[in-house]
UniProtKB/Swiss-Prot annotation:
Protein name as it appears in the record: Farnesyl pyrophosphate synthase
Organism encoding this protein: Saccharomyces cerevisiae (strain ATCC 204508 / S288c)
Requisite cofactors: Mg(2+)
Binding site for Mg(2+) 2: 100, 104
Gene designation: ERG20
Functional pathway: Isoprenoid biosynthesis; farnesyl diphosphate biosynthesis; farnesyl diphosphate from geranyl diphosphate and isopentenyl diphosphate: step 1/1; Isoprenoid biosynthesis; geranyl diphosphate biosynthesis; geranyl diphosphate from dimethylallyl diphosphate and isopentenyl diphosphate: step 1/1
Family, per entry: Belongs to the FPP/GGPP synthase family.
E.C. number(s) listed in UniProt: 2.5.1.10, 2.5.1.1
Keyword annotations from UniProtKB, A to Z: Isoprene biosynthesis, Lipid biosynthesis, Lipid metabolism, Magnesium, Metal-binding, Transferase
Binding residues annotated for isopentenyl diphosphate, in chain numbering: 52, 55, 93, 110
Record's cofactor remark: Binds 2 Mg(2+) ions per subunit.
Enzyme class, broadest EC rank: transferase
Binding site for Mg(2+) 1: 100, 104
Taxonomic path: Eukaryota, Fungi, Dikarya, Ascomycota, Saccharomycotina
Length: 352
């Protein structure tokens, strides 16, 4: 018997083939040959639906809460409308990941070769990334151009895309994999990187899109959402950094590589804030080296500095702050605190 979660995921996935068909129809309308249409369909299917789909599903879940319905109570037309916006976020994610994997020279993504590593693809993946982004605006135009919020959601996608790219830029110039310089790291910089690179598109964007469709568009309400979701997104990334270093491969489903990859993670930044001169020297000499002995030296310092305990203290403190903020939410214009509680519950004390 499929769980409620699996049934919801299945319903969401069922919308995607129609979107691929629609995007391909626009290529045919331009008179593109079959091989170009097939290539685009392959790229869309390879890069978009393979992940956890959390961002896309969040649009649907949030809209349902704002509409006082369960997801199952949404009629098909109403459901598809918000699901398309969910898929637009998944296309944005696909666009970022195809490009990121090339910049990071990654080998696999979601258990299969990265797109640029697929035979025949190579550097064509750069253009494919652009085309994944372009798909967002084709879909917004064909499904939403007659809605009063069309310009708002289009501008929101542009704005959040630019914010994410700024976060990526900061990350790339702060922590290049081949040039370790811990003097460039700081908790303030880490906060900027994760807010821009992750929080806006993964946490704020899904909720803001659902709010526009539900007719909750007052700037005060968008701000209420932002004021919880941006710090929540930062907490989510700090948790990710913590799990990469302290989680087991069985628990997180991968081997943590942040230390060897010279990542500007919360763990190293917290350690740099607290390290003695001697510990700092050891970190300078060993962080970012593709070497398990060097990695173990860094981990020993993290343990000596009790980073794990400090993370748990941080987690309790941020969760308490966010719960307090959520309890103050003004629901008089139709926004609902439950939207934010649902997000916090997904993140708090997760272990993978």
């Amino acid at each position: 018997m499929a769980s409620e979660k699996e049934i919801r995921r299945e319903r969401f996935l069922n919308v995607f083939p129609k979107l691929v068909e629609e995007l391909n129809a626009s290529l045919l309308a331009y008179g593109m040959p079959k091989e170009a249409c097939d290539w685009y369909a392959h790229s869309l299917n390879y890069n978009t639906p393979g992940g956890k789909l959390n961002r896309g599903l969040s649009v649907v879940d949030t809209y349902a809460i704002l509409s006082n319905k369960t997801v199952e109570q949404l009629g098909q037309e109403e459901y598809e409308k918000v699901a398309i916006l969910g898929w637009c976020i998944e296309l944005l994610q696909a666009y970022f990941l195809v490009a990121d994997d090339m910049m990071d020279k990654s080998i696999t993504r979601r258990g299969q070769p990265c797109w640029y590593k697929v035979p025949e693809v190579g550097e064509i993946a750069i253009n494919d990334a652009f085309m994944l982004e372009a798909a967002i605006y084709k879909l917004l135009k064909s499904h939403f151009r007659n809605e009063k919020y069309y310009i708002d959601i289009t501008e929101l996608f542009h704005e959040v895309t630019f914010q994410t790219e700024l976060g990526q830029l900061m990350d790339l110039i702060t922590a290049p994999e081949d040039k370790v310089d811990l003097s460039k790291f700081s908790l303030k910089k880490h906060s900027f990187i994760v807010t821009f690179k992750t929080a806006y598109y993964s946490f704020y964007l899904p909720v803001a899109l659902a709010m526009y469709v539900a007719g909750i568009t007052d700037e005060k309400d968008l701000k209420q959402a932002r004021d919880v979701l941006i710090p929540l997104g930062e907490y989510f990334q700090i948790q990710d950094d913590y799990l990469d270093c302290f989680g087991t491969p069985e628990q997180i489903g991968k081997i943590g590589t942040d230390i060897q990859d010279n990542k500007c993670s919360w763990v190293i930044n917290k350690a740099l804030e607290l390290a003695s001169a001697e510990q700092r020297k050891t970190l300078d000499e060993n962080y970012g080296k593709k070497d398990s002995v060097a990695e173990a030296k860094c981990k020993k310092i993290f343990n000596d500095l009790k980073i794990e305990q400090l993370y748990h203290e941080y987690e309790e403190s941020i969760a308490k702050d966010l719960k307090a903020k959520i309890s103050q939410v003004d629901e008089s214009r139709g926004f609902k605190a439950d939207v934010l509680t649902a997000f916090l519950n997904k993140v708090y004390k997760r272990s993978k």
